[in-house]
Amino acid sequence: MNGVALDIAIHGAKIALIFFVVLTLAAYLVFAERRLLAWIQDRKGPNRVGPFGLLQPLADLIKLLTKEDFRPAGADKWLFYLAPAMAAVPAILTFAVIPFGAPVTILGREIPLQVADLNVGLLFFLALSSIAVYGVALGGWASNSKYALLGSIRGLAQLISYELSMGLSLVPTVMLAGSLRLSDIVAAQEGVWFIAYQPVAFLIFLISIAAECKRIPFDIPEAEGELVAGFHTEYSGMRFGLFFVGEYINIIVLGGLATTFFLGGWQGPLLPPFVWFSVKTLAFAFFFIWMRGTLPRLRYDQLMHLGWKVLTPLALLNILITGWVLMFV
């Protein structure tokens, strides 16, 4: 096998592995969320399908595949069908630039555990997260439903507001690492994780990604008591499933990015690098589940106030302070 064919085979294997692992994790994250929320609420949760309910994700998949694929009268056909894919695909594509382990050597060849080690990896992530906004917008607008439209308008405002603070919170990590390449950012944390240098940036990023995931206490676009189910009210079957699984893939991806930027990525003592990366990422996922089970929903004005008047100015101030420290200290 020549070098080009081998490179294609290696990249294909990494892509297939990421698809399998991320989709499986997303399915079982739903199961874990239902069990954890049940424990918080003093009930049992799903425990009927398979031993300890472990086959519940498979049962949910079969249910979604066999449900009617309904399209409302007056809906824009092609945009209605396109929106779920635009919500789910950017999330999983972001995993292409995340280094989920140290490079491994196989048959004398060093293979990075990363699909694409781009020198603008951070910009790639920000670009894809911006594209996901269109899935929310199109899903609400194309449904020909006032509930879906109101949900998409709220979602657009929320995602744009917190996209800004999220991006600004990552600027200090780039200043410390001197690179936009995610593998370089991980390597720069070999001695001390960036959370030690940038606790304020980490806090801003954590709040911002919670808002990006549209989870409680930031689930304004899907407020059940007001908007039924928000921008995906009119979706059913596997198209609804794409919105649903996209949300949980986004949780995993954003947890992986938080790990990469602030918790040293795959670095850690004793355990293998991939295990460290997985443990840190899943810790963020369970933090989001815990928030859903314990916190109330914010009002819309509180949401906007937090994003524009607290997090964004604080992120800008943090950039100025970081620049001053790097220049003069």
From Swiss-Prot:
Pfam families assigned to the protein according to its UniProt record, in alphabetical order: NADHdh
Keyword vocabulary terms for this entry: Cell inner membrane, Cell membrane, Membrane, NAD, Quinone, Translocase, Transmembrane, Transmembrane helix, Ubiquinone
UniProt GO BP: aerobic respiration
Catalytic reaction(s) noted: a quinone + NADH + 5 H(+)(in) = a quinol + NAD(+) + 4 H(+)(out)
Any one GO molecular function term: quinone binding
Gene Ontology CC: one annotated term: respiratory chain complex I
Membrane topology category: Multi-pass membrane protein
E.C. designation(s): 7.1.1.-
Keyword check for Disulfide bond: no
Keyword Cytoplasm in record: no
Transmembrane segments: 12-32, 78-98, 120-140, 159-179, 191-211, 242-262, 270-290, 309-329
Localization in the cell: Cell inner membrane
Protein family: Belongs to the complex I subunit 1 family.
The protein's role, per its UniProt record: NDH-1 shuttles electrons from NADH, via FMN and iron-sulfur (Fe-S) centers, to quinones in the respiratory chain. The immediate electron acceptor for the enzyme in this species is believed to be ubiquinone. Couples the redox reaction to proton translocation (for every two electrons transferred, four hydrogen ions are translocated across the cytoplasmic membrane), and thus conserves the redox energy in a proton gradient. This subunit may bind ubiquinone.
NCBIfam families the record matches: PRK06076.1-2
Summary of subunit composition and partner proteins: NDH-1 is composed of 14 different subunits. Subunits NuoA, H, J, K, L, M, N constitute the membrane sector of the complex.
Official protein name in the record: NADH-quinone oxidoreductase subunit H 2
Species annotation: Geobacter sulfurreducens (strain ATCC 51573 / DSM 12127 / PCA)
